[in-house]
């Protein structure tokens, strides 16, 4: 289902994901011991982000609703982790991808700490796409 979403989204949305997939090795570098981080459910992955991202639980609900029965070989959690990144929120600055991208660009890599579980789920999901 996530693969279908990538095809159906406007080009800028697909580029956003494809750019991140191409940089997945780069994304791992700032996360200490990335390979030892467990893959957890989306709900567990966003728990450390509840105080950092406005409306994140509503975003998760919407993402999971859109990814109810994935047909792309991903689990609902995996597909929804990608959908969460793709969702546009209003105001746009509250969109999950904007917040995450700002954290990834930040000089202070300590800010990545609460994002580690989500990044692990997200990157492992992207790597499963055909």
Task: Set out the residue ranges of the language-model regions.
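N-terminal subdomain
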Residues: 1-130
């Amino acid at each position: 289902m996530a693969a279908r979403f990538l095809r159906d989204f406007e080009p800028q949305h697909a580029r956003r994901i494809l750019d991140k997939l191409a940089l997945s090795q780069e994304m791992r570098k700032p996360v200490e011991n990335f390979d030892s981080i467990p893959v957890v459910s989306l709900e567990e992955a966003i728990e450390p982000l509840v105080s950092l991202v406005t409306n994140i639980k509503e975003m998760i609900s919407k993402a999971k609703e859109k990814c109810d029965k994935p047909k792309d070989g991903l689990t609902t959690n995996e597909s929804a982790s990608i959908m969460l990144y793709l969702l546009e929120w209003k105001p746009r600055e509250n969109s999950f991808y904007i917040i995450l991208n700002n954290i990834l660009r930040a000089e202070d890599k300590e800010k990545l700490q609460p994002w580690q579980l989500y990044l692990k789920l997200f990157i492992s999901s992207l790597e499963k796409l055909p």
